[in-house]
C-alpha cells in the first residue's frame, strides 16, 4: 500500500440477499493509521460490510479496495494484507495459545523462525506471553479476546478488522481491550477498522461512520458530529431561580426554564460560557453542571430514534435479511 493511498476505499457498495438490500450503496474512505469505527445497532449492515471488505461475502454492486487491492478481483492480495477478529470466538479451546497462533502462522505462510519471534511480540503485547502454553479453554472471555487480537496481528497486516471486539465482556475488560487497541495503532503502524454499538467505544475512534438500515447517515470525527447536533445543556442551582432566569435573559440573551429543580438552558460552547456565568449573572450559584451532546443524540438527529430503539426495530430487518439468504 503506497504512502498516502487509502487503507480502505468504498464506492457505491451494495449487498442484497434475495429481495432484501442489507447494504445500500455506501461510500467512504479510511485513512492509513487511523482508528475508524462503524457505529450502529445490530442489523444496521456493519458486519455485512466488514465481511465484504474481508472477501468473505461478494458484493452485489459497487467497488471496494483494501490496502490498494480490489476485494473481488484481488481477493488473495486483500487477505494477505488484513487481519480479522470475528464477533464470535473462533479459537480452538483444546489447543494452547501458542498452538493456535502457530496454526495461523502456517496458514499465512509465515516462516517458522519469523513466526516464533512474532508470536512472542504479539503475546507480550496483549499480556499473554506467560500463558502461552495454557489451553485456551482455561482462559477468561477477556483473555480469549486478547488472544484473538494477537492472532489477527501475527502476519503483520496493513489493516486490522475488529467486528464488535468487546461484545459480551464486562466494562473493566472492555476498557482493557481498548487500551490494547489504542496501543496497537501507536506501536504497529496499522489501520484499525472496527464495528461497535457501544457509544463510549465509538468516542475513542478517530472518525466514525454512523450506519442505520444499510446506509451511512453521518461520517466525521466524534467531536464534530456532536458539535453539529446542537448546543450544550447547562443546569444551575441558585437561591432564586426566577431571578436567575431573568438575569440570563437580560445579560446573556439566554432563555431558561426550571426543570427537575434546577435552572436549565442551552448554549453553544458551554465550557467557555460557564466562567462568564459566574462573573456576570449577579445571582449566587450553588452548583453548575454541563452536558454536551452525545453520540446517541447524533444518532437520533439523523435517524429519529435512539440506538436502543433502533436495536429493537433492527430485529425485524435482520429477519428479512435471514429470509433473503434462504
Briefly describe each language-model feature range.
Residues 102, 106, 113-131:
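Conserved ABC ATPase "signature" region
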Residues 160-163:
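Catalytic Walker B motif of ABC-type/P-loop ATPase nucleotide-binding domains
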Residues 156:
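Conserved catalytic motifs of ABC-family nucleotide-binding domains
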Residues 175-188:
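Helical segment within the ABC ATPase nucleotide-binding domain
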Residues 231-306:
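Short, charged/small-residue-rich alpha-helical element at the C-terminal edge
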Amino acid at each position: 500500500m503506497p504512502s498516502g493511498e487509502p487503507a480502505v476505499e468504498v464506492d457505491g457498495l451494495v449487498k442484497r440477499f434475495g429481495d432484501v438490500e442489507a447494504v445500500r450503496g455506501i461510500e467512504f474512505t479510511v485513512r492509513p493509521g487511523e482508528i475508524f469505527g462503524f457505529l450502529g445497532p445490530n442489523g444496521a449492515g456493519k458486519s455485512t460490510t466488514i465481511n465484504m471488505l474481508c472477501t468473505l461475502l461478494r458484493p452485489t454492486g459497487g467497488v471496494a479496495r483494501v490496502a490498494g487491492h480490489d476485494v473481488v478481483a484481488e481477493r488473495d492480495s486483500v487477505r494477505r494484507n488484513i487481519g480479522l477478529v470475528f464477533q464470535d470466538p473462533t479459537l480452538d479451546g483444546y489447543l494452547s495459545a501458542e498452538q493456535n497462533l502457530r496454526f495461523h502462522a502456517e496458514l499465512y505462510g509465515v516462516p517458522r523462525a519469523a513466526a516464533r519471534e512474532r508470536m512472542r511480540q504479539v503475546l507480550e503485547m496483549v499480556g499473554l506471553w506467560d500463558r502461552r502454553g495454557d489451553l485456551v479453554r482455561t482462559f477468561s472471555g477477556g483473555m480469549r479476546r486478547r488472544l484473538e487480537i494477537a492472532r489477527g496481528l501475527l502476519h503483520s497486516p496493513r489493516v486490522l478488522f475488529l467486528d464488535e471486539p468487546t461484545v459480551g465482556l464486562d466494562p473493566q475488560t472492555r476498557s482493557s481491550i481498548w487500551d490494547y487497541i489504542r496501543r496497537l495503532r501507536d506501536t504497529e503502524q496499522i489501520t484499525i477498522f472496527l464495528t461497535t454499538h457501544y457509544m463510549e467505544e465509538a468516542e475513542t475512534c478517530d472518525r466514525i461512520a454512523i450506519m442505520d438500515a444499510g446506509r451511512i447517515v453521518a461520517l466525521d470525527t466524534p467531536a464534530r458530529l456532536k458539535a453539529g447536533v446542537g448546543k450544550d445543556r447547562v443546569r444551575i442551582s441558585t437561591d432564586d431561580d426566577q431571578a436567575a432566569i431573568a438575569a440570563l435573559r437580560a445579560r446573556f440573551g439566554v432563555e431558561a426554564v426550571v426543570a427537575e429543580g434546577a435552572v436549565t438552558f442551552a448554549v453553544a460552547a458551554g465550557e467557555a460560557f460557564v466562567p462568564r456565568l459566574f462573573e456576570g449573572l449577579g445571582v449566587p450559584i450553588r452548583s453548575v453542571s454541563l452536558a454536551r451532546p452525545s453520540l446517541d443524540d447524533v444518532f437520533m438527529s439523523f435517524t429519529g430514534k435512539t440506538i436502543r430503539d433502533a436495536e429493537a426495530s433492527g430485529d425485524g430487518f435482520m429477519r428479512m435479511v435471514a429470509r433473503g439468504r434462504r
